[in-house]
Amino acid sequence: MAALIQDDKGRYLITRRRGGSHLAGMWEFPGGKREPGESLEEALRRELIEELSATFSVGEKVQTVRWQYPERTVVLHFYRCRFESGTIEPLEQQAMEWVEPARLAELEFPPADRELIARLR
């Protein structure tokens, strides 16, 4: 799952994947993987606390993408999320930026995110 988080200026919060991970160095929308027994929404709330030190409400699902990379298949569920409380800061030593929608296409995102990015611009 991944969160589409916008600030009051309409910018999206993105984070950079750490070195040593699948697609290292690329930008992405914050999120992660579901643990057994979690709903997608519960997992996304947990991941956002773990990654960003803040709580968010999970809103509508915007898109689901299934993408086949040479080494694995991923299914991504993108949700609109709204900040609730805390201080947004990256806890997993990753870079974080607020980016205008028009700039998203200029940055290096995983191929699975491209269709969504085209919709957000």
Q: Model-derived features: where do they sit?
A:
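Conserved N-terminal beta-strand and adjoining loop/helix that marks the start
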Residues: 1-12, 33
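Short hydrophobic/aromatic beta-strand or adjacent loop that forms the aromatic wall/cage
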Residues: 2, 74-78, 113
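Hydrophobic packing within well-folded, soluble alpha/beta domains
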Residues: 3, 14, 43-48, 61, ...
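Active-site-adjacent beta-strand/loop module that shapes the phosphate/pyrophosphate-binding cleft
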Residues: 7, 55-57, 64-88, 95-97, ...
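A conserved beta-turn-beta hairpin within the catalytic core of GNAT-like acetyltransferases
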Residues: 22-26
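The catalytic Nudix box helix
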Residues: 29-61, 100
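Charged phosphate-binding loop/patch that engages nucleotide di/tri-phosphates or the phosphate backbone
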Residues: 112-121
